Amino acid sequence: MASVTITSVHEPANPLAVAHTGEREVEGDQLIKTDTNNDNDIINTLLNNFLYPQELKHNVFVPRFQQRITIVKAWDILSLSTSPPNGTNGANGTNSAPHRPKDLHILDIGCGQGESAATMAALLQPHMHGARLHITGIDTARPDYGTPYTVAETHAHLTASALGRHISFRREDAAAFFSPSRLSSPSPPGSWPSAANVDAVTLCHSLWYFPTPQSVADLFTTLAGARVPRVYLAEYSFRGSLPGGQQDAHILAARAQALLHASVLEKLSADSSQQNHQGREPGPRAPNVRAALDVGSIVEAAAAAGWAVRRQGTFVPAADMIEGHLEARLVVKDAFAEAVRAEGLSPEREHEVLGLVPGVKEAFARLAEAGVAKGRAMDVWWAELER
């Protein structure tokens, strides 16, 4: 069971929200734990509706879905339906009880193959009590991206599943989704869901894929202009709270990949080729970790567009979440060093990037000395933003 620290100015008010335990204080935050009584049922629902390689079921997809369940519960999105916030985009401006649940349209930005959209559909729909739920997932990835199943294949499978009536996908970015023409056009009857009635935006482990810090800042500006009431974030934090440096390999490897990406952008910018690089899909020469802003930089970018943190917290991923370990293993392989050298960076930049690799190897060596087979994923930070 994942432990979650939370800082909140508003108490969660729905059956999916994480429950307070009051067992101890951590740096002024209250330690809470997620209620996992129904998590296995939710995970089974997701596994029955999602397209994935069976051989990766237990090692990859069960922990991946469990992590997203922890995130969605911490976000407490359901409160937008049961107790609408004051503001725009369909909220009635009151919190009087009793309140009939309102329809909920969530925009999942950087949805990838749809894990987070599926998790929200499976977790939230049973509690809508007759109100409508729809998750629109958007991503700029090519339809043929992904292996062994492509983005197009996983999207088609999911939308044809039992969860599919609550999910749709578009290949576009937030600026296109919230284009002025869509926002300014009158909404005819039956137009729900649309760009004009988004109740919340989610970014679940997707901000690290953004190409530049400026692209993250532009996103928050776009969301502010669209008058979205709430934004929910979840991203790795570049911090580890476990003892013995168990998360160091993941942290250092992510820094190496982010520095490589920034260095390549810097070089291509000088060559007037940055736009081509930004459209390049992840691969041996474009790691999954791109701009990879830390928590402070994300909050700063959001604040510049008028967003404030309403609630936030952190949690340590479960021990069986191996994605951090796999990212770190990629960095210590010879292929990573070869990819760095193939980019044609300046000697100084190449030395700086490759100079982080020994630290990752040393982190693995310390774990081996302690009898630990795998490194742990770094802490996850989540937040709810409002304007």
UniProtKB/Swiss-Prot annotation:
Residue segments, region Methyltransferase domain: 98-223
EC number(s) from the headed UniProt entry: 2.1.1.-
Residue ranges crossing the lipid bilayer per the database entry: none
Annotated GO biological process: methylation
Protein's pathway: Mycotoxin biosynthesis
Record carries keyword Protein biosynthesis: no
UniProt superkingdom: Eukaryota
Protein family per UniProt: Belongs to the class I-like SAM-binding methyltransferase superfamily. Erg6/SMT family.
Name of the protein this chain belongs to: Methyltransferase phomM'
Record lineage: Eukaryota, Fungi, Dikarya, Ascomycota, Pezizomycotina
Gene name tied to this protein: phomM'
